[in-house]
Amino acid sequence: MTDITDDTGFKQALQGLDHASQRLLAARFVESVMSLATDDRIGHVIAVAARPDAGETELTEVLHSARAATLACHTRCGSEGDWKEQAGYFVARAATAAVTPEGKQFGGPAWQAAMSARMAQTARSIDTDEDCAGQERLSQYSLLSDFLNSR
């Protein structure tokens, strides 16, 4: 039984997963912050990413959608420092990471999605004065442990 308790173990465990497994896990990480999404396209992107049978053509299509949503969210953030919009931007980045092809990003899709999800929660923390990012990190450890133990 695997129990992830720190970022070192978290990253090592992620590196041991194949790309398809990382995509499925990345989708779970994004699902945990979906309430912070500010673009409706993200839900469809993650629905596709979460399917084990998602084909390359479909993944490419939703990657374009995720990138467009990320750009739109980034534009909405503006110079005002709207932390809710910042959170939405990071959710879009996490969704983009989940469907990015193999070898195109440092650390793989699950790592990038996890870090962007934490950034989304950091933005929420600034807006609400709660420790949302710390809770997200622990939730990710649990999601990964459950994922590994179910295999």
What residues fall within each predicted segment?
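Structured binding/interaction patches within domain cores
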Residues: 1-151
